[in-house]
Design a protein with these regions (language model features):
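A generic structural signal for short hydrophobic patches within well-formed alpha-helices
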Residues: 120-121
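Conserved non-catalytic scaffold segment of RNase H-like nuclease domains
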Residues: 1-112, 125-140
């Protein structure tokens, strides 16, 4: 069984206000084990990255100025994820941003099965604090 662990970084929190994807990272799993196959790319955007977002991911407009736009990596991304299940922490956020980028390109929304690890972590840990930084510290 093939699954893809996926994460994005963005210019801000609201795609409806024009925020965009600036980084995508994917890791392939077969039967829940990493194969070592990954896909990672940065995206140039004209939108200014929010200061709060920079504090989270450290990516700046200056760094991204030499990167291609999402459009140039979209097919490579879709070929990598295929129709396999996507494992995403706080999936609504990432999926909405990805679908927004795909929509800008005239492509259909993702149809992949989505496994959201955020509610799983909250249930397992019996805690509202379950962002990725916390989980990484908790599980080393």
């Amino acid at each position: 069984m093939r699954e893809i662990v996926l994460d994005t970084e963005t210019t801000g929190l609201n795609f409806k206000s024009g925020d965009r994807i600036i980084e995508v990272g994917c890791v392939e799993l077969i039967n829940h084990i990493s194969t070592g196959k990954t896909l990672q790319f940065y995206c140039y955007v004209e939108k200014k990255i929010d200061d709060g977002a920079i504090k989270v991911h450290g990516l700046t407009n200056e760094f991204l100025s030499s990167q291609p736009p999402f459009e140039e990596s979209a097919e490579k991304f879709l070929d990598f994820i295929k129709d396999d299940a996507l494992i995403i922490h706080n999936a609504d956020f990432d999926v909405n941003f990805i679908n927004n980028e795909l929509g800008i390109l005239g492509k259909p929304n993702l149809k992949n099965k989505i496994i959201d690890t955020l509610p799983l972590a909250r249930k397992k840990l019996n805690s509202r604090i379950s962002n990725l930084d916390y989980l990484c510290r908790r599980f080393s």
